[in-house]
């Protein structure tokens, strides 16, 4: 026996069902007791009254629920009361998402990105899909129509953007309008029954074979009339007129069936179906979280230099006269001339004296050795103070102002560690770990030892440390810093960074964070989840064709929605054998790969001068600038050609259509 086709029967609306009052056991018992306590005559009278009342109600209900035709009756919306429930239309497998929506995927303001989902409905009924962009409060801001790109897999896609792109910089006067668009957003994929397309498909066949034509055309006219009245479709008065005029033509029996059908196949109605469709049985997915960051937050070209080496020279006595923030203006101008847009400084805080390191990380410092800027803190101050050897806070603010005039951002290295002389050691001794002999433990990464650095112990007062770091970062942001490059964040609790970054970006949503974390993939991913916009990575050690192909695919794949790898050919701590052994050609090759292989790349100054001598036994530069002041001859860059190449690479990047 053939299965009965219920879909061929007239539908009745299910959108406004009468509310059903729940009956508890207690109320049922009370009603029963009340009924049994009545006398027989009273019960009989009550029964007659109840029967009459029921009959009247049933009669009224039957009149209200008169059968509706296919064109008149919308598919009902089925409310979802828990995340795992399906609606009337099924929505699955939304991308992009991060850990099934637990963490936000990251996109730039106004950046176009692809949203995909599986959207389907039972039987041969046609489905439609829309992407709804909503603000943090859940209010819809914009809709994007989705296209079915793989009917066999019910796969739908749409190019979506959140907010409007802007070329304004964080220091520009009108930047407040950009800041308001940054932060948490939601994307919801809405599936719906495409009643129009389902009807049109069948009606075209029926008109062609002359089968039940009048019913088909009448249903279409009713459908158009209902579409014109649908508030969800957000139609203009002109749009409604188009639909209603087509409905009248459909009802005009003086025309041929083909002419009547043609009225609903016009380009105007096809366009309305694309932009303002009739969406029956609307079903929303669970909201997908997105974090919108400022333009070029992941498209960046970094340039690193040490202020104490900028403008340094040999005095008449043969000793080096170090540079400072004022002489470092020359470094800003060089970075801008080469086309970079971020200047990254190492820590510029006072350097400790106790256990100060000498040249090449030697244990004993000479009388003229400046120490490592990563040995932070002295009696002159800590992380909230400018090293007097470099200048004052006013000098730093002037430095930032000049950078901004040149279109450059300032990124400041934030190394959360202390020298033995840091004010925190006395003010907060519980922030440090002590050995059994009572001394504070210095930093170690066996076999490496850092006697000039005390690591922070987060187990005693993490909340207090968080508040202090938030205060310090706020101070530097107000001075002109827009990016923090965090040193070794993977050696601190992820939750610590989650709290700090959330607090800082709540107040300053334009601020970005880069993780200098050479660590395991899980830790790198977790740091990205909690707000590190960019990350150092293992690009310097990817040299073969196979290694590069694999790494480029990884860097530019879906992982880019949470982790943005920044490619650096060298750093003060990284000088690979490839760069060491291949001279100018090697420097050129690695620069091209870095600039073209990732949206974000960086150069450590001196690259233009082919500084490629390794410290014996280490993959780092000899005479490391972390431990001494370097005097460089910048007039000699022309003979190498690397500075010109860097300039060309940045120009190619900035003028490429993919540049945001």
Task: Enumerate the language-model features and the residues they cover.
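Active-site-proximal helices and loops of the catalytic beta/alpha 8
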Residues: 487-565, 613-648
């Amino acid at each position: 026996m053939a299965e009965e086709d219920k879909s061929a029967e007239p539908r009745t609306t299910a959108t406004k069902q009468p509310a059903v009052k729940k009956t508890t056991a207690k109320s049922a018992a009370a009603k029963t007791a009340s009924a049994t306590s009545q006398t027989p005559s009273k019960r009989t009278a009550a029964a007659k009254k109840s029967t009459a009342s029921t009959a009247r109600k049933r009669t009224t209900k039957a009149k209200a629920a008169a059968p509706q035709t296919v064109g008149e009756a919308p598919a009902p919306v089925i409310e979802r009361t828990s995340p795992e429930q399906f609606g009337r239309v099924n929505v699955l497998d939304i991308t992009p998402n991060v850990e099934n929506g637990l963490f936000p995927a990251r996109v730039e303001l106004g950046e176009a990105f692809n949203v995909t989902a599986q959207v389907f409905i039972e039987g041969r009924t046609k489905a439609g899909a829309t992407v709804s962009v909503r603000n943090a409060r859940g209010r819809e801001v914009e809709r994007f129509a989705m296209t079915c790109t793989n009917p066999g897999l019910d796969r739908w896609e749409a190019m979506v953007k959140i907010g409007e792109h802007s070329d304004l910089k964080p220091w520009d006067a009108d930047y407040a309008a950009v800041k308001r668009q940054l932060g948490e957003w939601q994307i919801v994929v809405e599936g719906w029954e495409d009643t129009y397309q389902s009807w049109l498909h069948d009606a075209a066949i029926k008109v062609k074979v002359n089968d039940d034509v009048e019913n088909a055309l009448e249903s279409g006219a009713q459908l158009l009339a209902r579409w014109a009245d649908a508030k969800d479709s957000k139609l203009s008065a002109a749009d409604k007129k188009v639909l209603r005029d087509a409905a009248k033509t459909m009802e005009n029996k003086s025309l041929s069936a083909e002419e009547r059908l043609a009225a609903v196949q016009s380009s105007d109605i096809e366009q309305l179906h694309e932009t303002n469709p009739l969406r029956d049985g609307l079903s929303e997915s669970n909201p997908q979280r997105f974090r919108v960051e400022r333009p070029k937050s992941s498209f960046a070209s970094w340039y690193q230099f040490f202020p104490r080496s900028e403008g340094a020279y040999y005095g008449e006595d043969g000793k080096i006269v170090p540079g400072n923030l004022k002489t470092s203006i020359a470094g800003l101008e060089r970075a801008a001339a080469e086309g970079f847009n971020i200047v990254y400084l190492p820590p510029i805080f006072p350097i400790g004296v106790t256990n100060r390191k000498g040249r090449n990380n030697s244990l004993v410092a000479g009388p003229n050795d400046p120490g490592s800027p990563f040995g932070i803190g002295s009696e002159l101050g800590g992380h909230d103070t400018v090293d007097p050897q470099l200048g004052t806070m006013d000098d730093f603010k002037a430095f930032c102002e000049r950078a901004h005039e040149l279109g450059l951002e300032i990124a400041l290295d934030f190394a959360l560690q202390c020298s033995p002389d840091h004010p925190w050691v006395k003010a907060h001794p519980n922030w440090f770990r002590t050995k059994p002999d009572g001394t504070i433990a210095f930093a170690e990464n066996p076999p490496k030892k850092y006697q000039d650095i005390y690591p922070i112990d987060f187990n005693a007062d993490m909340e207090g440390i968080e508040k202090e770091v938030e205060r310090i970062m706020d101070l530097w942001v107000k001075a002109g810093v827009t990016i923090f490059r965090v040193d070794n964040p993977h050696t601190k609790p992820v939750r610590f960074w989650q709290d700090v970054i959330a607090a800082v970006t709540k107040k300053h949503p334009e601020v970005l964070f880069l993780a200098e974390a050479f660590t395991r993939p899980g830790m790198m991913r977790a740091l990205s989840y909690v707000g590190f916009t960019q990350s150092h990575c293992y690009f310097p050690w990817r040299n073969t064709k196979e290694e590069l192909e694999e790494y480029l695919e990884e860097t530019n794949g879906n992982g880019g929605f949470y982790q943005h790898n920044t490619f650096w050919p060298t750093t003060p701590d990284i000088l690979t054998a490839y760069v060491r052994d291949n001279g100018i050609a090697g420097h050129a090759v690695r620069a091209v790969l870095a600039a073209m292989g990732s949206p974000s790349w960086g150069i450590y100054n001196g690259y233009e001068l082919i500084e490629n001598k390794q410290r014996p036994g280490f993959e780092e530069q000899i005479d490391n600038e972390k431990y001494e002041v370097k005097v460089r001859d910048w007039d000699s860059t022309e003979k190498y050609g690397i500075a010109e190449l860097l300039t060309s690479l940045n120009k190619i990047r900035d003028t490429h259509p993919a540049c945001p």
